[in-house]
């Protein structure tokens, strides 16, 4: 029996995939700011340089946008016949010598004669070699240092790398180096600025804020349309993922990829909300110790109302369910467990407790027939698992 098809192009959901510049959603302001740092190099690359910090949480598009802007700039620089190169290095788990060796290695891959022995050389020798190479070729290098946080964590005081690169042009007759540092938290910036020798050169900071839910849903929709076949996902599912991704595009795309893989592996015709709950629950248990033992803290009646939400969601198979549908199951369960049902207004305390516990999200929406009602969703745990755990505690 042939498996149903989910993926049209799975590589487009890989975290390493970088969409082209014209397909990047949002970040127009940040793209313009970064490009404005590059553009003066086209006029006079030997008498202009810049140094800036790109700061923002993991997964908000910093590396993607800096890399794509750098590519666009390099295309333009060829039209101007400028001798400019861009090199991006990940500083994670590397010391200053390894970083400098990687810079020279990247230049060698671009066809330049920057071979240098990998052993028995000091950082100072590597730095001098790079300076001499750029000066003799009258080349301007834009150096992008990614993952600088881990580098700074291992070096509480200013390292030779940061000091020498911020002052790289001081001993040269031309401006031959521009520097971009990519960081994920402001603590790193604070540590860098503790040293006045570096601080005065790194005042230019471009902030990448977390995405809002609407933008994340738009990013997911664009990526899903390219990576997945039509009719295997609903817009509500993408909205569900966007809401639980903490403003991080990388996390949202990873959740979508995992849920799609789960549907594919289980021969499902489409990605369901329950598939998202399953992969999120696995992630939570693995990374954040999210566990159902927190159910013990809920009052007996609140557990029954939560079970009502679970059963209603299982019946409709949707991302969320209405108060009216939940109340139908709530009355049945109250009879099953021999307790008196509360009135709708009296359930507000139970709803609040469930929201605070993290098991349930609730929001009030307009309904087509007029008026407003509460909708409930469960995002962080499989409905089957939650039902089993609740019933075992309600015996």
What is the predicted function of each stretch?
Residues 1-49, 72-75:
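A short, basic N-terminal segment
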Residues 2-17, 44, 92-219, 229-244, ...:
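Mid-core helix/loop region of P-loop NTP-binding domains shared across ATPases and GTPases
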Residues 35, 302-309, 327, 348:
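Hydrophobic residues on short alpha-helical segments
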Residues 45-69:
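Walker A/P-loop nucleotide-binding motif
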Residues 52-53, 76-93:
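Conserved catalytic segments around the Walker B and adjacent sensor/switch elements
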Residues 262-287:
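Conserved C-terminal helix/linker of AAA+ ATPases
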Residues 287-320:
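Short alpha-helical segments that sit at the start of domains
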Residues 313-395:
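Terminal-proximal interaction/regulatory segments of ATP-powered molecular machines
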């Amino acid at each position: 029996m042939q498996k149903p098809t989910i993926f049209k192009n799975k590589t487009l959901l890989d975290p390493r995939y970088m969409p082209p510049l014209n397909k990047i959603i949002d970040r127009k302001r940040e793209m313009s700011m970064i490009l404005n740092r590059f553009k003066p190099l086209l006029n006079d690359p030997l008498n202009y340089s810049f140094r800036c910090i790109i700061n923002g949480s993991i997964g908000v598009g910093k590396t993607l946008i800096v890399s794509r802007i750098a590519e666009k700039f390099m295309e333009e620089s060829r039209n101007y016949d400028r001798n400019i190169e861009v090199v991006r290095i990940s500083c994670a788990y590397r010391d200053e010598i390894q970083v400098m060796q990687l810079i020279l290695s990247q230049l060698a891959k671009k066809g330049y004669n920057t071979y240098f022995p990998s052993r028995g050389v000091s950082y100072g020798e590597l730095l001098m070699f790079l300076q001499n190479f750029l000066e003799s070729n009258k080349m301007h290098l834009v150096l992008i240092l990614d993952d600088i946080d881990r580098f700074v964590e291992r070096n509480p005081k200013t390292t030779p790398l940061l000091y020498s690169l911020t002052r790289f042009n001081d001993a040269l007759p031309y401006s031959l180096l521009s520097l971009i540092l990519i960081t994920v938290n402001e603590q790193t910036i604070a540590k860098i600025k503790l040293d006045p020798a570096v601080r005065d050169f790194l005042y230019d900071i471009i902030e990448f804020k977390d995405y809002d839910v609407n933008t994340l849903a738009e990013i997911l929709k664009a990526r899903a349309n390219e990576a997945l076949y039509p009719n295997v996902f609903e817009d509500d599912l993408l909205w569900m993922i966007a809401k639980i991704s903490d403003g991080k595009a990388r996390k949202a795309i990873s959740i979508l990829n995992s849920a799609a893989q789960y549907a594919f592996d289980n021969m499902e015709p489409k990605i369901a909300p329950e598939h998202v709950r399953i992969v999120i629950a696995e992630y939570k248990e693995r990374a954040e110790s999210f566990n159902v033992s927190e159910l013990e803290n809920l009052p007996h009646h609140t557990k029954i109302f939560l079970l009502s939400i679970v059963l209603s969601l299982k019946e409709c198979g949707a991302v969320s369910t209405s108060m009216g549908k939940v109340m139908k199951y709530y009355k049945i369960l109250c009879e099953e467990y021999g307790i008196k049902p509360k009135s709708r207004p009296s359930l507000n305390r139970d709803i609040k407790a469930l929201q605070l516990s993290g098991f349930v999200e609730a929001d009030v929406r307009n309904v087509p027939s007029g008026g407003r009602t509460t909708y409930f969703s469960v995002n962080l745990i499989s409905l089957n698992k939650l039902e089993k755990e609740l019933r075992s505690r309600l015996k």
